UniProtKB/Swiss-Prot annotation:
Source organism per UniProt: Haemophilus influenzae (strain PittEE)
One GO CC term, this protein: cytoplasm
Subcellular location, principal: cytoplasm
Catalyzed reaction equations: alpha-L-fucose = beta-L-fucose
Originating gene: fucU
Name of protein: L-fucose mutarotase
Source organism superkingdom: Bacteria
Amino acid sequence: MLKGIHPALSPELLKTLAEMGHGDEIVLADTHFPAHSLHKNVIRADGISIDILLEAITPLFEFDAYVDAPLLMMKAVEGDSLDPNVETRYLNAIESAVGFTPNLTCLERFDFYTRAKQAYAVVVSGEIAKYGNIIIKKGVTPIL
């Protein structure tokens, strides 16, 4: 255990966040996401909701300032419903952790899958919300 590190962050996830460079993306996926068929670098965070993971990750993570939206979510498939509280919950978690909310855009389901394949890693969470997946694009970490 380390002081100042959120207990939701496993050693494997901390290592992954540290390895990522600017422009790299990480997927925080719900329990329904086909992580293992889309990606080789899959990290388990069973039982931990994505809003908790966002509260844990975002204080350690610089968002990419050179893109319009460093946050990406999946749109509901036509004819399906999406709980608007999911996006609100995620943005509130980020706001609570870092004091602001970066821009967010939504991708069609298969565009999201294509983007997820290119990510640095996929974190499978305990999130049960339908379409509860989010991609975060890492920015340049300022040197203090």
